[in-house]
Amino acid sequence: MLDGLGYSRDRLALIKEQAWKNLPSNVSSLLLTQADSVLQRNPDSINRDPEYLAMDALIPVAAENLPENAVFDEANTRLKTLEALTAASAGTDVMEKVAEVVRAQALRMHYVPIAANARHLAEIRNSNLTIPTSASGRWAGFEDVDPPVQGNSDTGHQQITNLRLAPQLPMEITESINNGSFFRNTELAGIVSRAVADRRPLNFTYLLSGVGGTDGRVHSAWNHLEAFLRLVFEVHNADPRLVHMQAILDGRDSPDTSSMTSPTNADGETGGGYVERLQELLRRYGAERSLAWIIGRNQAMDRDYREPNVRADYLSMTGGDTDTVKGFGGLKRTLTRLHRDGFVDGDVPAMAVLHGDAQAARIGPGDSFVDLNFRADRQRAKIATLAGARNLLTRESNSRGRNWTFEWMRSDLNLDICGLADYHPELGTRYGVKAAFPNRPHRDNLLSLFPSFAPDDQYLLVGESVKALHMGYFIRGRREDPATSNCEIRHIVPSFGEQEGVVNDSDVYKVPSMRTVEITNHLVEAMSARRYPLICANLASTDMLGHLLPRHFEAAVAAYEAVDIALARIVTVARDFGYHVVITSDHGNIEDDTSSHSINDVLTTVIAPQGRLTAARREVYQARLFDVSWTVGRILGVEAELKRHMASTGDANFGGPDVGRPIVEPV
């Protein structure tokens, strides 16, 4: 999995157009002559315009020229014709000049995949079966809205190893709001009613994000916040003075200063200006004073168990020494100043918001706490500290080479805690944390079925610790543990930390390759041993550096180049030792010059040890992420077993849009 690597048809079209204009006339003339000659030899080509074909040749990866949902036969013909042109031009000064001009245009436009000095991946894509793959919106398990909900890492990994579309929790929550069951939810309604009845403070946290499909909605959704406030203030008539909100600023899955700005994105959708939106929402209930704390997500949602970040988040709510601002007015002035000084939302330090003469709110013993963010990985540390789950925190931090002191954690809080989702099973079973929407593992997950079709074998998961849950909980189909104790080997490399200057996720530009080399070394060693029939790996840098665009463009380019070198090595060794390779991505990110994920397609490439695989015929030349597991099953020779499983669950509709199918013809 190349985390966060998609491609933008719109931006590629602009690069193609401008680069064509910038080509020296002798180069474009030679390319047109070659294109005309190829068309004469390929009478089946749909478009007979030599310039159309010549301009396609400007884009390094041929499949990225295809429109979304291209008719299968037309796409095949277009790719074959383009392949003939590039073969005729290969090794000539023409293509060298084309590459130079195209890269210069990509540098001007900050289009990382072409701006990077990286030709290995393009060559791998063009030499093997490569197909556009849907990775957002409905095809990522979200609501079918326009514009689509951006793809993200957790759902992408869930889809990649599922045999059918894996529905996501945000859709389930939204459906419960629409049918009214949200307001009768046993755990949510219960914790609110207990707090109101006992006149105890009701504290809650929410990431300011997710108004529409493309401005977040990765960890939170605005309609979930609206519904919760309705539950609190309309259904249960809570006193706003006893409701305390921690508002987390995003700037990663939404524009980096969107707490204060309200940009219109490429889809014409307005998002951002979240602080103003929040003030208006709270004002409906006379509850502006309920905003108690502000903090950036890099401290409030640290998933790599960096103690200084988790401590700052905890102490800001429980009574540590925290900066203060006076009301929404003071908050807006402070954020404007911080943005002017170069801070992005994710790096905003913790602040308590004071209202009138009241002192800063503090979480105290016996209070209630609700977490309104639905994605598990970035809520675990927060909820574990509030629940006093030292064993869990020690285990997770030690696995990343970190040793916590815990001197700042209180032992007397005994909070009544409810999460919107189930963040970790141990939080419920050992520490009494409730989940409004309990976790339901995906039934049709390839890895959970692995022991049934390969009982004597093991598969290998490899990644680094910032993506530990992706190479674990998410890729297993929302399972904390493998199906059996001996079917899985997992190797997680600790991500860079404080010693390398990486205090939080905003610092990864300092080592943009991240742990790509170490992961590659482990993959090479594993393939050389020929021990595992199936190996799954995550290369994280393209996503992690994509989140730092446009500020750290050069570092993003370096991250891409590191992945390009790694893939060349991985593919070479895989072929040497008889492995097939499937290269795909969980979602788009680094191809757009913004901090957030994209709704763009990704590419899936399937490589055989020898020769070239053929695309399995389908209506359109377009895959879905949940086609990958069927492709792997076909390569492993267990397709029949997977079909029997689907039939046994009553879901044998193999032609349906929500059931996957192999990308390749039988191997």
Language model features: what each stretch is:
Residues 1-14, 29-33, 38, 47, ...:
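Feature captures the catalytic ectodomains and active-site-proximal regions of enzymes
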Residues 68-71:
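Structural helix-adjacent loops and short alpha-helical linkers that scaffold large soluble proteins
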Residues 75, 79-85:
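Amphipathic, non-membrane alpha-helical rod segments
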